[in-house]
């Protein structure tokens, strides 16, 4: 499961739909001001994935996180934060379903969402 926390770019949202489709994820939760289908710019980049990936809209990201946790999900924010686990060291031997929260392109994942998450995963990058 993927949770998008106030993503501003329609193209980024569409790319996540395509990735979710490719990995056969259980679904996506779009939160805050994250653009939602149907929209021409999302449809063009998503290439039909908005039809094959289940998605929901929840205004408040923290509500979405707490809802999934109440259903037994382990929730991890993808963010550089104190105590983050490098992706290469992340243990994926969970018996519970997993949800990843991706944050705004500038601000990242909201601090209250990080606090409510079961942890943070950091994806090392060579670029900026």
Task: Give the residues covered by each predicted segment.
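Post-transcriptional modification and biogenesis factors for structured RNAs
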Residues: 1-128
